[in-house]
């Protein structure tokens, strides 16, 4: 499957990295890599996330981080909708 990031998801990832980087640049890079690696695995395993709170979405927990990736699947495409901090509702 092809992975496509929405503009919102790209902005979310950039924002969280910039925020973490203010306090710990190494941690910011580590978190961004963890998110990107986990998202890449959706190409082979698009059903690995749990059913989302919003209809027709799935939520992928990023291990060892407080982040969740919300995504949808349509035909052969996984669309990354947003990246959320678990404290956000």
Language-model segments: residues:
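Basic, Lys/Arg-enriched alpha-helical interface segments
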Residues: 2-57, 74-77
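Enriched for short, Lys/Arg-rich terminal
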Residues: 62, 66-68, 72-89
